[in-house]
Amino acid sequence: MCMLLREIITHVPCVKCGFFVIFNNVKQRFKKYILIQSLLSPSYFNITDAKSFIETYSCIYKDRPMIVWIDSPYYVEHGCDMRRAKVYVTSHYVKKLLNGTIHVDGVLRPPFNQVAYDERASNVKKEYLFTVLASEPGDGTAIRKRVKYTLDILRQLNMRNSTLVISNVGDFDMRSYTLDEREKYRLLHKSYFYLSLSKNEGFGLPLMESMSVGTPAVYVNAFAFKEYAVGIPIDPYDVIIEETSYGKMDNYLIRDSDVRNALQEARECIKTSCYDELSAKALEKSKEFEMPNIEEKILSDFKSVMRHR
């Protein structure tokens, strides 16, 4: 952390990933300091994956003052409490996944990109019934987003042609992480609903991004989504713990019939006042993700952790 140079080195472990999106959205809101990404090693400020960070670094840095902002869909199985760190999670659900390995100072929601302010003021024509924005890990060993399942259901209901799919699996229309933020928010705005049938989400950035332009969701009513999502929920009938190559994760099970009913309900909703009401509620709820004072909060936390070195 180079306070004299007005730079804060921030550990973000990847580029084409949700953590980098959060980093850039936070960076937009910093006026006094510039955030500089560090890919390789922890720093004073960390926006990163809970499982990999805690299991790899928490015992090494257990006495190091730092800010750790974490998200993950996977259970953390071992680690050490970082007594001098400020630790934030993106959702109450992520706190559960930590299994008590590390203390948590609070829930800190990721902010949306500020292009949302311009986009929500634009008068756009809706072109898609649904947008699916979801990627699976490149090696395909962990199926968490259920993209192919989603596409199959949409085809059965003759809804595939009215759905925009941004992904890296299945017959997607656009590849993930090829759009700039303005293009992404415009496409979300052009959709009536964001559609996610994920087995679980630590937070779920695209749903929050959709809500920031008034686009509600059809979503699984569990994990982090249950904390903030607005739209048409699909209640799971059970949850199992699934072993993956990345670790253990919750798999919230949903019935095909419930998914079909929700998709058909969405198609009917856009014909009535139902849709305008959901859109207004989504926009109102998205105020929780404006985070105008994030710089002041982070700087205050820096002073606190450094004071107790």
Curated annotation (Swiss-Prot):
The keyword Transferase belongs to this UniProt entry's keyword annotation: yes
Family annotation (Pfam families): Glycos_transf_1 (PF00534)
Domain of life: Viruses
Listed GO MF terms: glycosyltransferase activity
UniProt-listed InterPro entries: Glyco_trans_1
Keywords on record: Glycosyltransferase, Transferase
EC numbers for this chain: 2.4.-.-
Family under the similarity heading: Belongs to the glycosyltransferase group 1 family. Glycosyltransferase 4 subfamily.
Protein name: Putative glycosyltransferase 48
